[in-house]
A protein has these predicted regions:
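Active-site nucleotide/adenylate-binding loops and adjacent lid/helix of ATP-dependent enzymes
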Residues: 2-131
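ATP-dependent carboxylate activation and anion-phosphoryl transfer catalytic cores
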Residues: 54, 97, 106-110, 118-213
Length: 213
């Protein structure tokens, strides 16, 4: 199920796709375009709602205090967290939320969408969840992304494209150098899976697929 289908089918989940509202409820320092930041620093700038996924059009920017015109309309700024980027899949069963699996992603602040790899974690981190997590029950499936244990977004479906029994994936992007293709293609145990994703045309550098093992 895609995020737009969750939006259509689970009205109670719609509020949680509003990342500005989510960040405010979680107590983060954040605000919409037109609201100046409280201090000069680097902030994450993202669309308030993005149902296309992939972190498309999100970026890190240094914004000066009291400047209120550096963020595009429809976007918001939020304090930036550093630490492990972890994605956890959960399922609701009989009113209880159960974690199923977790993966850690590796990217850089220069290109937030572009992950160099994802690795399955042998143990699922026990991160704190808000009391209002029960609002997600209608979706049955839940994916939460964390940075340093702090929630950055929620999805009413399971995340990641890990094939069964895979422990690591390496995304291949349109601009991935040929030498990297050759390396993984010729290295034992790595298998290529075509899996095109351009976030509904918003990524100029789409993902073509990934190697996994």
């Amino acid at each position: 199920m895609d995020d737009y289908q969750v939006w259509q089918d689970v009205p109670a989940f719609r509020r949680l796709y509003n990342k500005l509202d989510l960040s405010l409820r979680l107590g983060y320092t954040c605000g919409p375009a037109g609201v100046p930041v409280p201090k000069t620093a680097e902030y994450v700038v993202r669309p308030i709602i993005n149902l296309s996924g992939m972190g498309a059009t999100s970026y890190v920017q240094k914004i000066k205090k009291d400047i209120d015109h550096d963020v595009p309309l429809g976007y918001f700024w939020c304090e930036m967290f550093t630490g492990d980027h972890v994605s956890i899949n959960y399922s609701w069963r009989k009113g209880e939320l159960y974690p199923l699996n977790a993966v850690q992603g590796f990217n850089s602040k220069d290109e937030l969408y572009r992950f160099s790899s994802w690795k399955r974690l042998p143990e699922i981190p026990n991160y704190d969840l808000p009391d209002w997590i029960t609002e997600t029950m209608g979706a049955h499936k839940l994916n939460i992304e964390f940075i340093d244990g702090k929630i950055i977004e929620m999805h009413g479906r399971h995340g990641m494209d890990f094939p069964e029994n895979a422990t690591e994936i390496v995304p291949v992007w349109k601009d991935t150098e040929a030498e990297q293709h050759v390396f993984y293609h010729n290295t034992k145990d790595w298998i290529f899976k075509p899996n095109y994703e351009d976030a509904d045309g918003t990524l100029d550098n789409p993902r073509l697929g990934f190697y996994y093992r």
